[in-house]
Every structure is written in C-alpha cells, then in structure tokens.
C-alpha cells in the first residue's frame, strides 16, 4: 500500500513488517514474542484538528465498519495478542479492510 508521494513512508512501514518475523525468531530464545499492529484510520487527538466533514469522509472510506477506529478497539487487539501465546512474528492489520487510494 502507498499513496503517491509517500514512497519513503510506505517503505518504512514495509521495513517494520519485514523485520517482525526475524526479530520474533531471534528473541524467542528469551521467551519474548514480537507482533506488529498495522492500524488503519483511528481517532486520535491529531484528528480532532480536522473539520467534521473531513472526519466523515475518512470514515466513509472504511469498508466495514464504515467509521474511524476507536482507541479501545486498538487496546482490545493488544489484550488479545498478550492473552494468546501462539501469536508471534506476525503483522495484524486493524483497518476495517481500508486501502488508501493512490492519491
């Protein structure tokens, strides 16, 4: 995924995804797990600066549920990752199936 003009940002995200499994394997001997969460568009204080029309537009682009993600939904995934010891070395997209348009 990546939008026009955001090659460096997209590459940095790809780097995180690409190193998740090797780091999980490396740290396994110490009993550590490594997971990556790739969030979609979540409500944050930064978004509070946007006009409501822009927020509605962003939320409507999410296939389902058609809204912005909420912090408690992110936290729920973190709790699930912690609770399940078999989750290791994986990236989970938490994004309501959104893929940003090229521009």
Question: What does each model-found stretch correspond to?
Answer:
Residues 4-8, 31:
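Conserved catalytic loop/helix region of short-chain dehydrogenase/reductase
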Residues 9, 17:
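Catalytic tyrosine of NAD(P)H-dependent dehydrogenase/reductases that use a Tyr as the general acid/base
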Residues 12, 20:
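Active-site helix of classical SDR
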Residues 25-29:
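Alpha-helical segment proximal to the catalytic Tyr-Lys
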Residues 30, 35, 90:
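Rossmann-like NAD(H)/NADP(H) cofactor-binding core
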Residues 38-49:
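Short, flexible catalytic-loop segment of classical short-chain dehydrogenase/reductase
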Residues 53-73:
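Catalytic Tyr-x(3-8)-Lys segment
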Residues 70-94, 99:
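C-terminal substrate-recognition "lid" of short-chain dehydrogenase/reductases
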């Amino acid at each position: 995924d990546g939008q026009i003009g955001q090659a460096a940002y997209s590459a940095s995200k790809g780097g995180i995804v690409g190193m998740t499994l090797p780091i999980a394997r490396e740290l396994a001997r110490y009993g550590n797990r490594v997971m990556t969460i790739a969030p979609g568009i979540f409500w944050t204080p930064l978004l509070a600066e946007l006009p409501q029309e822009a927020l509605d537009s962003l939320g409507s682009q999410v296939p389902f549920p058609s809204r912005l993600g909420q912090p408690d939904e992110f936290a729920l995934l973190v709790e699930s990752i912690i609770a399940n010891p078999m989750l290791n070395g994986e990236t989970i997209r938490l994004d309501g199936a959104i893929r940003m348009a090229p521009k």
